[in-house]
């Protein structure tokens, strides 16, 4: 009987530790985010953001792949859950283009949280919506 109680205790302890580990999500911006941005509801550009918390800063890229754009800075204001993202890219002719996005982080308690706001890329301005995958 004592051995059986010990085995049950060990199983429950292992389950408790594994559930606690799953609950740890880390920084609220960490992950892959996908969505779109554009000046109108019909003129949209697909965008993927990959963001990681390195212990001091949020780093990452826009549209990972051969033409990936490194994020210059990411700022999260936890008092009102606003996000500011800055990056520098090049247009098709090779000229520099500044990208800035400012938005609000919503559905904080959900894994599939969202950021919505304003996207500026060079002279173009529109809204954006991304959801964490």
Predicted segments with their positions:
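Bacterial N-terminal signal peptides that target proteins for export
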Residues: 1-10
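Bacterial N-terminal signal peptides
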Residues: 9-18
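Sec/Tat signal peptide C-region and signal peptidase I cleavage site
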Residues: 19-23
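Central antiparallel beta-sheet cores of small beta-barrel/beta-sandwich binding domains
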Residues: 24-133
């Amino acid at each position: 009987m004592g051995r059986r109680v010990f085995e049950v205790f060990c199983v429950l302890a292992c389950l408790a530790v594994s559930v606690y580990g799953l609950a740890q999500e880390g920084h609220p911006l960490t992950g892959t985010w996908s969505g779109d941005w554009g000046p109108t509801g019909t003129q949209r550009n697909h965008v993927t953001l990959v963001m990681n918390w390195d212990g001091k800063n949020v780093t990452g890229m826009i549209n990972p792949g051969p033409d990936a754009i490194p994020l210059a800075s990411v700022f999260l204001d936890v008092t009102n859950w606003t996000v500011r993202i800055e990056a520098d890219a090049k247009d098709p002719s090779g000229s520099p283009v500044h990208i800035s996005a400012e938005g609000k982080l919503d559905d904080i308690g959900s894994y599939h949280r969202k950021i919505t706001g304003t996207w500026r890329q060079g002279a173009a301005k529109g809204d954006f919506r991304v959801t964490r995958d």
